[in-house]
Protein backbone atom coordinates (compact mmCIF):
# COMPACT_ATOMS: atom_id res chain seq x y z
CA UNK A 1 0.00 0.00 0.00
CA UNK A 2 1.64 3.20 -1.15
CA UNK A 3 0.55 6.36 0.54
CA UNK A 4 2.55 9.30 1.67
CA UNK A 5 2.61 11.16 4.97
CA UNK A 6 3.70 14.77 4.88
CA UNK A 7 4.24 16.27 8.30
CA UNK A 8 4.73 19.90 7.24
CA UNK A 9 1.96 22.41 6.72
CA UNK A 10 1.96 23.98 3.27
CA UNK A 11 2.34 27.74 3.38
CA UNK A 12 -0.07 28.06 0.51
CA UNK A 13 -2.64 30.84 0.47
CA UNK A 14 -5.33 28.31 -0.25
CA UNK A 15 -4.40 26.02 2.63
CA UNK A 16 -2.68 28.30 5.14
CA UNK A 17 -2.79 27.61 8.86
CA UNK A 18 -2.50 30.44 11.35
CA UNK A 19 -1.82 30.00 15.04
CA UNK A 20 -4.10 31.35 17.75
CA UNK A 21 -2.82 32.41 21.14
CA UNK A 22 -3.78 29.09 22.70
CA UNK A 23 -1.77 27.15 20.13
CA UNK A 24 -4.72 26.06 18.06
CA UNK A 25 -3.95 26.18 14.37
CA UNK A 26 -6.70 27.33 12.07
CA UNK A 27 -7.17 28.12 8.42
CA UNK A 28 -7.57 31.73 7.44
CA UNK A 29 -11.27 32.13 6.85
CA UNK A 30 -12.58 33.78 3.74
CA UNK A 31 -16.07 33.02 5.01
CA UNK A 32 -15.53 35.87 7.46
CA UNK A 33 -14.26 38.34 4.85
CA UNK A 34 -16.10 40.27 2.20
CA UNK A 35 -15.64 38.66 -1.20
CA UNK A 36 -17.66 39.32 -4.29
CA UNK A 37 -17.16 35.72 -5.35
CA UNK A 38 -18.86 34.38 -2.23
CA UNK A 39 -21.95 32.28 -2.68
CA UNK A 40 -25.44 33.65 -2.41
CA UNK A 41 -26.91 30.22 -3.13
CA UNK A 42 -26.78 27.02 -1.16
CA UNK A 43 -25.56 24.75 -0.97
CA UNK A 44 -5.73 1.64 8.41
CA UNK A 45 -6.74 -1.67 7.60
CA UNK A 46 -4.69 -4.85 6.83
CA UNK A 47 -4.18 -5.57 3.14
CA UNK A 48 -6.32 -8.32 1.66
CA UNK A 49 -8.79 -8.04 4.51
CA UNK A 50 -12.17 -6.81 3.35
CA UNK A 51 -14.97 -5.48 5.49
CA UNK A 52 -18.54 -5.84 4.35
CA UNK A 53 -20.43 -2.90 5.82
CA UNK A 54 -24.16 -3.04 6.20
CA UNK A 55 -26.45 -0.10 6.90
CA UNK A 56 -26.92 0.77 10.55
CA UNK A 57 -29.63 3.28 9.87
CA UNK A 58 -32.45 1.03 11.00
CA UNK A 59 -31.10 0.21 14.43
CA UNK A 60 -33.70 0.54 17.15
CA UNK A 61 -33.69 3.48 19.56
CA UNK A 62 -35.88 3.87 22.60
CA UNK A 63 -35.81 7.66 22.30
CA UNK A 64 -37.84 7.69 19.11
CA UNK A 65 -40.66 5.35 20.07
CA UNK A 66 -42.72 7.56 22.36
CA UNK A 67 -46.00 9.38 21.85
CA UNK A 68 -46.31 11.98 19.07
CA UNK A 69 -44.67 15.32 19.95
CA UNK A 70 -46.76 18.46 20.24
CA UNK A 71 -44.98 19.95 17.21
CA UNK A 72 -46.01 18.25 14.00
CA UNK A 73 -43.50 15.61 12.92
CA UNK A 74 -43.30 16.07 9.16
CA UNK A 75 -40.78 13.34 8.42
CA UNK A 76 -43.27 11.46 6.25
CA UNK A 77 -44.35 14.53 4.31
CA UNK A 78 -42.54 14.56 0.93
CA UNK A 79 -43.29 18.27 0.54
CA UNK A 80 -41.74 19.35 3.81
CA UNK A 81 -38.19 19.87 2.54
CA UNK A 82 -39.13 21.75 -0.63
CA UNK A 83 -38.89 25.29 0.68
CA UNK A 84 -35.94 26.07 -1.56
CA UNK A 85 -34.74 24.68 -4.90
CA UNK A 86 -32.13 21.95 -4.90
CA UNK A 87 -28.88 22.24 -6.83
CA UNK A 88 -27.29 18.94 -5.75
CA UNK A 89 -29.21 15.66 -5.65
CA UNK A 90 -28.27 13.63 -2.59
CA UNK A 91 -26.53 10.27 -2.75
CA UNK A 92 -24.87 7.87 -0.38
CA UNK A 93 -21.21 7.10 -1.00
CA UNK A 94 -20.83 3.40 -0.27
CA UNK A 95 -17.91 2.55 1.97
CA UNK A 96 -15.40 0.42 0.01
CA UNK A 97 -15.30 -3.21 1.08
CA UNK A 98 -11.52 -3.03 1.14
CA UNK A 99 -10.46 0.37 2.43
CA UNK A 100 -6.75 -0.33 1.98
CA UNK A 101 -6.86 1.37 -1.40
CA UNK A 102 -8.47 4.57 -0.12
CA UNK A 103 -5.16 6.06 0.99
CA UNK A 104 -3.15 5.04 -2.06
CA UNK A 105 -1.62 8.09 -3.76
CA UNK A 106 -3.06 10.30 -1.02
CA UNK A 107 -0.85 12.87 0.69
CA UNK A 108 -1.58 13.22 4.40
CA UNK A 109 -0.33 15.68 6.97
CA UNK A 110 -0.63 15.68 10.74
CA UNK A 111 -2.61 18.46 12.38
CA UNK A 112 -0.30 20.54 14.57
CA UNK A 113 -0.77 21.05 18.28
CA UNK A 114 -0.95 18.60 21.17
CA UNK A 115 -4.75 18.74 21.24
CA UNK A 116 -4.82 17.19 17.74
CA UNK A 117 -2.13 14.58 18.31
CA UNK A 118 -2.30 11.60 15.97
CA UNK A 119 -4.91 13.21 13.71
CA UNK A 120 -4.02 12.94 10.03
CA UNK A 121 -5.84 14.80 7.26
CA UNK A 122 -5.64 14.99 3.50
CA UNK A 123 -3.29 17.71 2.30
CA UNK A 124 -5.85 19.35 0.06
CA UNK A 125 -3.34 21.40 -1.93
CA UNK A 126 -2.12 18.08 -3.36
CA UNK A 127 -5.52 17.56 -4.99
CA UNK A 128 -4.61 20.17 -7.62
CA UNK A 129 -2.22 17.65 -9.18
CA UNK A 130 -4.57 14.72 -8.67
CA UNK A 131 -7.47 16.49 -10.38
CA UNK A 132 -6.17 18.64 -13.24
CA UNK A 133 -8.65 20.33 -15.52
CA UNK A 134 -12.01 21.93 -14.90
CA UNK A 135 -13.49 20.81 -11.58
CA UNK A 136 -14.30 22.20 -8.14
CA UNK A 137 -10.69 21.79 -7.03
CA UNK A 138 -9.24 23.84 -9.88
CA UNK A 139 -12.05 26.38 -9.69
CA UNK A 140 -11.58 26.90 -5.98
CA UNK A 141 -7.83 27.33 -6.11
CA UNK A 142 -7.71 29.36 -9.33
CA UNK A 143 -10.43 31.78 -8.22
CA UNK A 144 -9.05 32.11 -4.67
CA UNK A 145 -12.61 31.53 -3.53
CA UNK A 146 -14.15 29.12 -1.06
CA UNK A 147 -17.74 29.66 -2.13
CA UNK A 148 -18.81 29.17 -5.72
CA UNK A 149 -22.59 29.47 -6.17
CA UNK A 150 -24.26 26.10 -6.58
CA UNK A 151 -20.89 24.46 -7.25
CA UNK A 152 -18.67 24.40 -4.17
CA UNK A 153 -19.38 25.28 -0.54
CA UNK A 154 -15.95 25.30 1.10
CA UNK A 155 -15.47 21.63 1.97
CA UNK A 156 -11.79 21.53 0.99
CA UNK A 157 -10.79 23.71 3.94
CA UNK A 158 -10.83 23.20 7.67
CA UNK A 159 -12.53 26.30 9.03
CA UNK A 160 -11.44 27.83 12.33
CA UNK A 161 -14.79 27.30 14.05
CA UNK A 162 -14.28 23.57 13.58
CA UNK A 163 -11.26 23.79 15.86
CA UNK A 164 -13.31 25.84 18.33
CA UNK A 165 -15.84 23.03 18.53
CA UNK A 166 -13.15 20.35 18.82
CA UNK A 167 -11.63 22.26 21.73
CA UNK A 168 -15.05 22.53 23.35
CA UNK A 169 -15.55 18.76 23.09
CA UNK A 170 -12.50 18.29 25.29
CA UNK A 171 -13.20 21.10 27.76
CA UNK A 172 -16.85 20.18 28.25
CA UNK A 173 -16.18 16.44 28.15
CA UNK A 174 -18.89 15.94 25.56
CA UNK A 175 -20.08 12.34 25.65
CA UNK A 176 -20.41 10.53 22.33
CA UNK A 177 -20.64 6.94 23.58
CA UNK A 178 -23.73 5.19 22.25
CA UNK A 179 -24.90 8.23 20.29
CA UNK A 180 -26.04 8.39 16.68
CA UNK A 181 -24.23 11.44 15.27
CA UNK A 182 -24.51 13.54 12.11
CA UNK A 183 -21.61 15.73 10.95
CA UNK A 184 -23.59 18.16 8.78
CA UNK A 185 -21.59 20.10 6.18
CA UNK A 186 -18.69 17.91 7.25
CA UNK A 187 -15.87 18.87 4.86
CA UNK A 188 -12.82 17.28 6.50
CA UNK A 189 -15.07 15.25 8.79
CA UNK A 190 -13.07 16.07 11.92
CA UNK A 191 -16.17 16.55 14.08
CA UNK A 192 -17.61 13.18 13.12
CA UNK A 193 -14.23 11.49 13.40
CA UNK A 194 -13.91 12.79 16.95
CA UNK A 195 -17.38 11.45 17.74
CA UNK A 196 -16.43 8.07 16.30
CA UNK A 197 -13.26 7.95 18.39
CA UNK A 198 -15.40 8.86 21.40
CA UNK A 199 -17.51 5.75 21.04
CA UNK A 200 -20.49 6.93 18.97
CA UNK A 201 -22.52 3.93 17.84
CA UNK A 202 -23.02 5.38 14.36
CA UNK A 203 -21.69 8.47 12.55
CA UNK A 204 -23.01 9.96 9.33
CA UNK A 205 -21.06 12.52 7.31
CA UNK A 206 -22.76 14.93 4.87
CA UNK A 207 -21.21 17.49 2.55
CA UNK A 208 -22.56 19.42 -0.42
CA UNK A 209 -19.90 18.10 -2.80
CA UNK A 210 -19.38 14.45 -3.68
CA UNK A 211 -15.74 15.05 -4.57
CA UNK A 212 -15.13 16.39 -1.06
CA UNK A 213 -16.66 13.23 0.42
CA UNK A 214 -14.60 10.91 -1.82
CA UNK A 215 -11.27 12.73 -1.72
CA UNK A 216 -11.24 14.39 1.71
CA UNK A 217 -13.82 13.02 4.16
CA UNK A 218 -13.44 9.31 3.36
CA UNK A 219 -9.61 9.31 3.40
CA UNK A 220 -9.66 11.27 6.67
CA UNK A 221 -12.03 8.73 8.23
CA UNK A 222 -9.84 5.82 7.10
CA UNK A 223 -6.60 7.55 8.11
CA UNK A 224 -7.82 8.05 11.66
CA UNK A 225 -8.89 4.47 12.27
CA UNK A 226 -6.04 2.59 14.00
CA UNK A 227 -4.06 0.90 11.22
CA UNK A 228 -2.88 -2.68 11.47
CA UNK A 229 -0.17 -4.52 9.56
CA UNK A 230 -0.59 -6.02 6.10
CA UNK A 231 -0.90 -9.67 7.10
CA UNK A 232 -3.98 -11.53 6.01
CA UNK A 233 -4.96 -12.85 9.43
CA UNK A 234 -3.64 -16.41 9.02
CA UNK A 235 -1.79 -17.90 11.98
CA UNK A 236 -2.22 -14.70 13.95
CA UNK A 237 -2.77 -14.50 17.71
CA UNK A 238 -6.36 -14.11 18.79
CA UNK A 239 -5.63 -10.63 20.13
CA UNK A 240 -4.48 -9.34 16.75
CA UNK A 241 -7.52 -10.77 14.96
CA UNK A 242 -9.73 -9.14 17.57
CA UNK A 243 -8.09 -5.75 16.95
CA UNK A 244 -8.72 -6.12 13.21
CA UNK A 245 -12.36 -6.89 13.93
CA UNK A 246 -12.60 -3.72 16.02
CA UNK A 247 -11.14 -1.66 13.17
CA UNK A 248 -13.73 -3.12 10.83
CA UNK A 249 -16.54 -2.14 13.15
CA UNK A 250 -15.22 1.42 13.37
CA UNK A 251 -15.32 1.74 9.58
CA UNK A 252 -18.71 0.08 9.25
CA UNK A 253 -20.43 2.43 11.67
CA UNK A 254 -19.69 5.36 9.35
CA UNK A 255 -21.85 6.37 6.38
CA UNK A 256 -21.15 9.18 3.92
CA UNK A 257 -23.55 11.35 1.92
CA UNK A 258 -23.34 14.26 -0.50
CA UNK A 259 -25.89 16.70 -1.82
CA UNK A 260 -28.00 19.66 -0.79
CA UNK A 261 -29.55 19.52 2.67
CA UNK A 262 -33.18 19.16 1.62
CA UNK A 263 -32.25 16.34 -0.76
CA UNK A 264 -30.16 14.64 1.92
CA UNK A 265 -33.11 14.97 4.27
CA UNK A 266 -35.41 13.22 1.82
CA UNK A 267 -32.86 10.51 1.04
CA UNK A 268 -32.32 9.30 4.59
CA UNK A 269 -35.99 9.59 5.50
CA UNK A 270 -36.83 7.11 2.74
CA UNK A 271 -35.23 4.41 4.86
CA UNK A 272 -37.64 2.16 6.68
CA UNK A 273 -37.51 2.59 10.44
CA UNK A 274 -35.17 5.56 10.15
CA UNK A 275 -33.72 6.44 13.55
CA UNK A 276 -33.13 10.13 14.16
CA UNK A 277 -29.83 11.59 15.31
CA UNK A 278 -29.02 12.06 18.98
CA UNK A 279 -26.45 14.70 18.12
CA UNK A 280 -25.96 16.93 15.07
CA UNK A 281 -22.59 18.68 14.77
CA UNK A 282 -22.15 21.55 12.33
CA UNK A 283 -19.58 24.29 11.85
CA UNK A 284 -19.75 27.50 9.78
CA UNK A 285 -23.00 26.57 8.04
CA UNK A 286 -25.05 29.68 8.91
CA UNK A 287 -23.10 32.18 6.84
CA UNK A 288 -25.94 32.77 4.38
CA UNK A 289 -29.47 33.68 5.58
CA UNK A 290 -30.91 32.17 2.39
CA UNK A 291 -30.09 28.73 3.81
CA UNK A 292 -31.71 29.16 7.20
CA UNK A 293 -35.10 27.74 6.28
CA UNK A 294 -33.65 24.53 4.83
CA UNK A 295 -31.15 24.14 7.68
CA UNK A 296 -33.86 24.65 10.31
CA UNK A 297 -36.09 22.14 8.51
CA UNK A 298 -33.24 19.63 8.44
CA UNK A 299 -32.76 19.93 12.19
CA UNK A 300 -36.52 19.61 12.74
CA UNK A 301 -36.84 16.46 10.65
CA UNK A 302 -33.63 14.62 11.53
CA UNK A 303 -32.94 15.41 15.21
CA UNK A 304 -34.24 13.12 17.94
CA UNK A 305 -36.75 14.85 20.23
CA UNK A 306 -34.29 14.52 23.12
CA UNK A 307 -31.26 15.28 20.95
CA UNK A 308 -29.25 18.44 20.51
CA UNK A 309 -27.38 20.41 17.87
CA UNK A 310 -23.90 21.76 18.58
CA UNK A 311 -23.19 24.61 16.18
CA UNK A 312 -20.09 26.77 15.70
CA UNK A 313 -20.16 30.07 13.83
CA UNK A 314 -18.64 33.49 13.46
CA UNK A 315 -20.64 36.37 14.90
CA UNK A 316 -21.10 37.80 11.41
CA UNK A 317 -20.12 36.85 7.87
CA UNK A 318 -19.30 39.92 5.84
CA UNK A 319 -20.31 39.78 2.22
CA UNK A 320 -23.11 37.23 2.67
CA UNK A 321 -24.79 38.69 5.73
CA UNK A 322 -25.36 35.69 7.96
CA UNK A 323 -24.19 35.12 11.50
CA UNK A 324 -25.12 34.00 14.98
CA UNK A 325 -27.50 36.77 15.99
CA UNK A 326 -29.47 36.68 12.75
CA UNK A 327 -29.76 32.90 12.94
CA UNK A 328 -30.84 33.00 16.58
CA UNK A 329 -33.55 35.49 15.67
CA UNK A 330 -34.70 33.22 12.85
CA UNK A 331 -34.86 30.24 15.22
CA UNK A 332 -36.75 32.20 17.86
CA UNK A 333 -39.35 33.31 15.32
CA UNK A 334 -39.92 29.68 14.32
CA UNK A 335 -40.61 28.77 17.93
CA UNK A 336 -39.44 25.15 17.63
CA UNK A 337 -35.97 25.18 19.19
CA UNK A 338 -34.33 26.78 22.19
CA UNK A 339 -30.84 28.18 21.67
CA UNK A 340 -28.13 28.55 24.28
CA UNK A 341 -24.72 30.15 23.92
CA UNK A 342 -22.06 27.76 25.17
CA UNK A 343 -18.97 29.87 24.59
CA UNK A 344 -17.82 33.11 23.00
CA UNK A 345 -14.34 33.28 21.46
CA UNK A 346 -13.03 36.82 21.09
CA UNK A 347 -9.72 36.04 19.38
CA UNK A 348 -9.66 37.45 15.86
CA UNK A 349 -13.14 37.47 14.38
CA UNK A 350 -15.66 36.94 17.18
CA UNK A 351 -17.01 33.39 17.21
CA UNK A 352 -19.76 31.54 19.05
CA UNK A 353 -20.54 27.99 20.08
CA UNK A 354 -24.26 27.35 20.40
CA UNK A 355 -26.57 24.53 21.46
CA UNK A 356 -30.04 23.92 20.04
CA UNK A 357 -32.66 21.67 21.64
CA UNK A 358 -36.38 21.19 21.11
CA UNK A 359 -38.58 23.44 23.25
CA UNK A 360 -40.97 20.53 23.76
CA UNK A 361 -38.84 17.37 23.77
CA UNK A 362 -41.71 15.05 24.64
From Swiss-Prot:
Post-translational modification: Monomethylated at His-144 through automethylation. Automethylation at His-144 positively regulates the methyltransferase activity toward RPL3. Probably methylated on other residues.
Entries under SUPFAM superfamilies matching the protein: S-adenosyl-L-methionine-dependent methyltransferases
Amino acid composition bias (Polar residues), ranges on this chain: 52-65
Basic and acidic residues bias (residue ranges): 30-51, 73-82
Keywords in alphabetical order: Cytoplasm, Methylation, Methyltransferase, Nucleus, Phosphoprotein, S-adenosyl-L-methionine, Transferase
GO cellular component: cytosol; nucleolus; nucleus; protein-containing complex
Catalytic activity: L-histidyl-[protein] + S-adenosyl-L-methionine = N(tele)-methyl-L-histidyl-[protein] + S-adenosyl-L-homocysteine + H(+)
A molecular-function term among this protein's GO annotations: heat shock protein binding
Region (Disordered): 18-88
Modified residues (Phosphoserine): 62, 67
Protein role: Protein-L-histidine N-tele-methyltransferase that specifically monomethylates RPL3, thereby regulating translation elongation. Histidine methylation of RPL3 regulates translation elongation by slowing ribosome traversal on tyrosine codons: slower elongation provides enough time for proper folding of synthesized proteins and prevents cellular aggregation of tyrosine-rich proteins.
Family, similarity comment: Belongs to the methyltransferase superfamily. METTL18 family.
Name the record gives this protein: Histidine protein methyltransferase 1 homolog
Amino acid sequence: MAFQFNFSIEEDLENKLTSLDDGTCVLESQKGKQDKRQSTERPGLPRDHSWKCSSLGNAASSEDTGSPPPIADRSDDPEACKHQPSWKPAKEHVMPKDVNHVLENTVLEMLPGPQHANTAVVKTVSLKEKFPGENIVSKSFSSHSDLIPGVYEGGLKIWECTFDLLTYFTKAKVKFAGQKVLDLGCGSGLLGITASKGGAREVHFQDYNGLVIDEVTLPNVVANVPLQDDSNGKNEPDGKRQRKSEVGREICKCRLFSGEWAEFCKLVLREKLFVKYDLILTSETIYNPDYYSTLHETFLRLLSRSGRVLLASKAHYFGVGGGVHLFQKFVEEKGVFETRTLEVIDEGLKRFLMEMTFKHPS
